[in-house]
């Protein structure tokens, strides 16, 4: 019997997804305005977040539910290390630090892993499915905006172990639907996914100060004034 979790997550996070895509930093990024100093701080935050998520998922490799959604092909830690080496140099570990919003995000991942590991599914869904869905578009924007013509700095968006991203996403969603969870657990996973979108938004918002310094408040306001319809909202409309 299907849990219908994939559709619950898609419908239940639609508003949060759209809100995240309307954060100023994200809107500027999608319009091709990316400032390298801000972007590398985001990469550093992602390194801590994905490291925590992947470590905690691995801790539950024998869990009857969490283990089903733990696909090693999705792991981003190693690709983020490559990007950090590019943006910061060989001693990147000595230079990066976790922002307050990033720290709250990591703490939440550690907390639910210890108390209700099924909720890790929400964080996997929020990050990995988004990475697969928009990865190539974001990669191309980053390459153009930051003049990354040497093929480096975008390893995060490359899934070397996934040959067909569309087929993999379908498999991922099917796996969500096959999870042996009750309705209450499914609802808590949807709630946690909405919280995860909120934590991502806070990380993006932290970066807006640096971006405004780089491009100026007038341009920032021009780029972010109009509300953008989110990807999930457009899909529903179609």
UniProtKB/Swiss-Prot annotation:
It catalyses: heme b + 3 reduced [NADPH--hemoprotein reductase] + 3 O2 = biliverdin IXalpha + CO + Fe(2+) + 3 oxidized [NADPH--hemoprotein reductase] + 3 H2O + H(+). The keyword Oxidoreductase applies. GO terms for molecular function: heme binding; heme oxygenase (decyclizing) activity; metal ion binding. Its EC number is 1.14.14.18. Pfam families: Heme_oxygenase. Keywords: Heme, Iron, Metal-binding, Oxidoreductase, Photosynthesis. CDD domains: HemeO. Disulfide bonds: none annotated. Belongs to the heme oxygenase family. This is Heme oxygenase 1. The lineage of its organism: Bacteria, Bacillati, Cyanobacteriota, Cyanophyceae, Nostocales. The gene is pbsA1.
